[in-house]
Structure formats: C-alpha cells, structure tokens
Amino acid sequence: MLTIEMDNFDLGQICRSGQCFRMDQIGDDRYRVIAGDKYLELTQERGIVNFFCPEEDFIFFWIRYFDLDCDYSEYINMINPRDKYLTAAGEVGSGIRILQQDLWEMIISFLISQQNNITRIKKCIENISREFGVRKQAAQVQNIMRFRLQRHWLWQRKSSFGSVIWDTEQNMCWTQPEKSVSEIFHLTVCMI
C-alpha cells in the first residue's frame, strides 16, 4: 500500500465524473478501478489517499492514469475571480482529475455512450467483454497488512491486435479486441 497526501483529488468526484465506467465505490470511502489490465483499490480520508497496488504499478501506471504529476491547484488559481460560473465550477469540481485512459477504451466507451445511460453503458461493455474474452484470475489487495489472491475473475483473449478483459464483479475492462475495429464497431452497435 502506498499512502499519499494530496490536494485536488476526490475519489467520489472522479468516480461520478463519467470519465470511465470501471471505477466503482465498494464501501465507505473505498473504490476499485480497472484500467487496461490493471486492478486498483483505493481509500481516501480527506486528503490522504491509500493506493492498494504494487509500487511498480503505481509508479509506471497509476501516476499517469490519475494525472498525479499535474498540480491542479495551479489551474484553479488561474480562474478569473470575476468569472462566477467558472469560479463555482472550480470549487465544486476541485477534486476531479483528468484520467489518462487508453485510447482504444475511450473510443469504444464513447461509441457505446451515444443515447445510453451509465448502467446501460456498463452492461454493453460487459457484453462485449464476455463475447471476446476468456477467464483470468486477478490479484487484489484485501487490506493494509496482506496481499492475497481473491476469486476475482477477468476474461482475457490475446491476439496480435491485443486483448479484451472483463471482470465478473462489474469491473469491466479491456485493452484491445481480437476482432477488427470494424467488426467490433458492428457488434457494439448491435449490442446497444
């Protein structure tokens, strides 16, 4: 577990921002995220955030994903105080981060999102992943003191073009499909 103290980072605001469909609240101030082939659990109490993942994953993946190298207070301080609308937005959404997501994932999510709500988008992602994946077990951190392998299943199918991953606990994720982009687009439209 890595503990970081930071400003302008609110897990609840990020989860509700609609940027990704695989971040879920799983308890009081506890969240889980699947991005690409990575799984992360986080807790937050005020400005203290605990990342339950290997340090290597945090350094090489999650710092970039959550844009942690960027000081968002600089942006907020640049808002013209006479702009009441933007000032209010900066105050209300001060904990939102711009997630640095996989391009393929964003494109598919965007295609699915047209004329859909979040519940339906998650279901479509689940359907695509079930169609193109195979089961894979994922490791996750259960608490601060120990790391154990939980019965947390992902589906993954490898090909020269990439892989598709789906998690049975409603944490859908994938990197890239085995099918061509046009085949996936057609199947996505059919599943919507």
Give each language-model segment a name.
Residues 1-192:
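HhH-family (HhH-GPD) DNA N-glycosylase catalytic core used in base-excision repair
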